[in-house]
């Protein structure tokens, strides 16, 4: 990548003279600027688009939000997700600010690309159309995540100056939704996006992902006809199917499997997360800040289809995890369950109070609930539990459930 550098030549008269004037309104020499970046780099568009994907979603947001519900608990009393869960949060809480800042940074990146893509030289028209489609869907998803959490939010499709960003007003939620749906309709109806990608481009927004996001928006608004129509199209034309193993669905060996419609992109060494450090037991190097709650465990039904409290249930308190929905074993680490290491070794965990290294109450790094998380365990992790495993944002099971709800 080359950057044009303009030399400033000061005349000898100015240097020698007692008074001189230096033009401070010049481009910096040590980095590219917006003045030249788009025109000089033929890959400027795809590089900018890749940056937009960084803000699509992340693993810690995916998992920590469970602590706002009856599914999980975070043992740090000053944690913002705990505050949201008990209703004591404020806009100054770190998690709230992180979601707000992250989503609006993603929106700004999309707006930067959309405003400047015409300046990129020799960009293939079909690629340009696709990049615009990807950016508009990414922006739509960011707005969806904002208005579903905050209601009325500032809406803009331009890059704001600092002054403008300090004075922009909130836009009515209904207007935000209408604008987001208009963008999605443009992309979907205009065939901006392919239905699939080659191996080098897996993880990018497809036509089906755009439609799935549109279905989620309509589901949130209770427009059942639209939800049914969109999800039915995905079901009949998308070529997706449920993955054969629920546990395997969330393993790095099975990324981009038949059920994944949209996931946030991570990659070993280049973009990783360290969420396993947050939810694993001490035996595997974790400190279990985030732990499943009993309410989540109790919600898994028996193999006979009955709940554990239903009359005639086969639930046995002396063997509480036997004959349960297999998703329980794949999601929650309980006493007798195990993590499989890369070499095939099974590490069996004992969560019982006062027992071993991982038992409830044994140490500050142990679970606060007597359970650990198993879902999204990545046995290919690097040192200190760094992982490149992608969190799934939308999968085919979501489409089936939305379709059923809309009937």
What residue ranges belong to the model's regions?
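Conserved, well-structured interaction surfaces
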Residues: 41-57, 79-150, 165-178, 184-198, ...
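Bacterial Sec-dependent N-terminal signal peptides
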Residues: 1-30
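Membrane-proximal, proline-rich intrinsically disordered regions
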Residues: 20-64, 300-311, 318-319
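Secondary-structure transition into beta-strands, especially the periplasmic turns and strand N-termini
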Residues: 4, 18-20, 119-136, 221-236, ...
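Proline-centered turn/helix-capping motifs that create local helix->coil transitions or kinks
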Residues: 22-25, 60-62, 73-77, 146-155, ...
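Hydrophobic, small-residue-rich alpha-helical packing segments that form membrane-like cores
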Residues: 155, 159-255
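Flexible, polar/acidic helix-loop-strand segments at domain edges
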Residues: 315-395
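Polar, glycine-rich mid-to-C-terminal structural blocks
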Residues: 213-222, 231-318
């Amino acid at each position: 990548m080359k950057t044009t550098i303009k030399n400033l030549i000061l005349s000898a008269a100015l240097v020698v003279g007692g008074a001189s004037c230096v033009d401070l309104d010049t481009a910096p020499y040590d980095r590219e600027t917006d003045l030249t970046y788009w025109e000089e780099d033929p890959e400027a568009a795809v590089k900018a688009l890749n940056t937009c994907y960084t803000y699509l979603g992340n693993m810690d947001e995916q998992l920590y939000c469970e602590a706002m519900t009856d599914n999980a608990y975070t043992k740090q009393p000053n944690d913002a997700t705990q505050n949201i869960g008990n209703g004591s949060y404020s806009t100054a809480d770190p998690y709230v600010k992180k979601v707000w800042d992250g989503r609006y940074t993603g929106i700004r990146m999309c707006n930067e690309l959309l405003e400047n893509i015409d300046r990129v030289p020799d960009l293939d028209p079909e690629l340009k159309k696709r990049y615009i489609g990807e950016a508009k869907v990414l922006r739509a998803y960011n707005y969806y995540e904002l208005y579903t959490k905050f209601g009325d939010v500032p809406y803009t499709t331009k890059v704001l100056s600092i002054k403008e960003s300090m004075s922009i007003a909130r836009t009515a939620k209904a207007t935000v939704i209408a604008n987001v749906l208009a963008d999605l309709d443009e992309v979907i109806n205009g065939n901006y996006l392919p239905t699939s990608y080659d191996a080098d481009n897996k993880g990018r927004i497809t036509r089906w992902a755009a439609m799935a996001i549109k279905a989620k928006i309509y589901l949130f608004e209770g427009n059942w006809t639209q939800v049914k129509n969109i999800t039915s199209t995905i079901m009949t034309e998308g070529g997706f199917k449920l993955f054969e193993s629920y546990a395997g669905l969330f393993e790095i060996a099975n990324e981009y499997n038949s059920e994944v419609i949209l996931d946030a992109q991570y990659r070993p060494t280049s973009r990783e997360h360290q969420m396993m450090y947050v939810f694993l037991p001490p035996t595997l190097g974790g400190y279990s800040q985030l732990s499943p709650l009993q309410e989540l465990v109790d919600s898994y039904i028996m193999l006979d289809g009955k709940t554990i409290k239903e009359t005639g249930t086969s639930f046995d308190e002396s063997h509480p995890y036997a004959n349960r929905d297999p998703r329980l074993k794949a999601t929650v680490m309980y006493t007798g369950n195990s993590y499989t290491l890369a070499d095939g070794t099974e590490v069996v965990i004992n969560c019982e109070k006062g027992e071993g290294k991982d038992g409830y109450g044994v140490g500050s790094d142990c679970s606060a609930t007597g359970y650990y998380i198993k879902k999204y365990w990545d046995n290919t992790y690097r040192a200190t539990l760094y992982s490149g495993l992608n969190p799934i944002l939308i999968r085919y099971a979501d489409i089936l459930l939305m379709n059923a709800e809309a009937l």
